[in-house]
Design a protein with these regions (language model features):
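Surface-exposed, short loops/turns at beta-strand junctions within beta-sandwich domains
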Residues: 77-95, 180-189
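Acidic, Ser/Thr
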Residues: 38-45, 144-157, 239
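Short beta-strand segments within Ig-like beta-sandwich modules, predominantly Fibronectin type-III
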Residues: 63-69, 168-177
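Conserved structural position at the C-terminal beta-strand
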Residues: 2, 98-102, 196-198
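Extracellular interdomain linker/stem segments of modular secreted and single-pass surface proteins
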Residues: 15-23, 116-128, 211-220
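Edge beta-strands of extracellular beta-sandwich domains
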Residues: 3-15, 105-118, 202-212
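Short, solvent-exposed loop/linker segments at the N-terminal edge
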Residues: 25-33, 131-145, 226-238
């Protein structure tokens, strides 16, 4: 402390008291495969604890302790911690808080950043097709229908929310993993696009080819006419 005096009184100047630790820099965005970092200033040399918080005001993950009056801290995230962060992120991206406590969690400093999911597309395990009204093992034009049964798996805690099949004047989209066409009107190698969408909005697609044999139902052609006694057509004098 310093004192000074004059005829008008005296001045008392207090020394600067170090306060909380602060985050001074951090990446504006990072991927789920990255190790995030931040720079900090800790003029009071307090004890510190940092954390990652998807969806701010939620649970704290990847807690670490650190020390020093300034520096850069980088997480070395474990596979379990990455799994926790991914499952907490409900979209293709989400807000994640980089937080820093100091002085036994008395003060907090934080930056809210963008967390980006990568390689999170669902997997189509199989697309099974069944021929309804076949001829033997053949899928026949104008006779047979095709039933699609789709098996797919979402990643990192997401769920499959939509199944879709389209092609050759057929279209289906819905929450059920099965659908069926009406009678197939075309023949040849018909291609159908199968798409699944998960709860984060990620999609995966595949092409399914169905071989359809050309077929038309038989027709009967009839003609009526006059004939003579020998059965020969005679439109003028036949009976």
């Amino acid at each position: 402390d310093r004192f000074s005096s004059s005829e008008n009184g005296y001045t008392h100047t207090l020394t600067t008291i170090p306060r909380q630790a602060n985050i001074t820099d951090s990446p504006t965005a990072f991927k789920d495969t990255d190790n995030p970092w931040f720079k900090y200033s800790n003029p009071g040399n307090f004890n510190m604890e940092c954390w990652l918080e998807p969806n701010p005001n939620g649970e704290h993950y990847a807690k670490r302790t650190l020390s020093g009056t300034s520096g850069t801290f980088t997480w070395e995230l474990t596979n379990d911690e990455r799994k926790q962060l991914r499952e907490a992120c409900k979209g293709k991206t989400c807000t994640i808080r980089i937080g820093l406590y100091s002085n036994n969690c008395s003060w907090a400093s934080y930056h809210d950043r963008t967390y980006q999911m990568t390689n999170a597309e669902p997997t189509i395990n199989s697309v099974v097709t069944s021929i309804i009204n076949p001829f033997g093992s053949l899928c026949l034009q104008n006779r047979s229908n095709i039933k699609f049964t789709i098996s797919a798996t979402a990643k990192y805690g997401a769920t499959i929310t939509n199944y879709a099949v389209s092609g050759n004047n057929f279209s289906y989209a819905g929450s059920k993993n099965t659908c069926q066409t009406s009678n197939i009107r075309d023949s040849g190698s018909l291609k159908y696009t199968v798409t699944v969408t998960d709860s984060r909005g990620f999609t995966a697609s595949t092409i399914k080819t169905i071989n359809v044999t050309g077929y038309s139902y038989p027709t009967i052609s009839m003609e009526a006419f006059r004939s003579n006694s020998s059965g020969t057509k005679d439109v003028s004098s036949g009976t």
